[in-house]
Amino acid sequence: MTDDVALPLQFTDAAASKVKNLISDENNPDLKLRVYITGGGCSGFQYGFTFDDKVNEGDMTIEKSGVALVVDPMSLQYLVGGSVDYTEGLEGSRFIVTNPNAKTTCGCGSSFSI
């Protein structure tokens, strides 16, 4: 998918830039950032991030600045309308998900409920 198409999940410039830097450190240009949702955390669901060099059937791939964000169909249904960003601050540096579908989130923001 390209930057010109309305996407169900936004991949910010800051996140794409950080992914590009991390991938260059790994010397594997096939790596993509995978965002996923699993059961757990104090609010019921939690976000996860990993680098993956494959795209599975049904996965959505969002490309920006020469790197890709990959989301499986199950996770995507909970993330529609959200964004994946990267931030650096007093709490450290991390990828964050802004999710308009989350009814409540825990204090650290890493888990949520629908």
UniProtKB/Swiss-Prot annotation:
Co-factor(s): iron-sulfur cluster
Cofactor binding summary note: Binds 1 iron-sulfur cluster per subunit.
GO cellular component: cytosol
PROSITE patterns xrefs: HESB
Keyword Methyltransferase attached: no
GO MF term set: 2 iron, 2 sulfur cluster binding; 4 iron, 4 sulfur cluster binding; iron ion binding
Keywords of the record: Iron, Iron-sulfur, Metal-binding
Positions in coiled-coil regions: none
Binding site for iron-sulfur cluster: 42, 106, 108
Matches recorded under SUPFAM superfamilies: HesB-like domain (SSF89360)
Gene Ontology process terms (BP): iron-sulfur cluster assembly
Function of the molecule: Required for insertion of 4Fe-4S clusters for at least IspG.
Annotated family: Belongs to the HesB/IscA family.
NCBIfam families to which the protein is assigned, alphabetical: iron-sulfur cluster assembly accessory protein, PRK13623.1
Quaternary data: Homodimer.
Name of the protein in question: Iron-sulfur cluster insertion protein ErpA
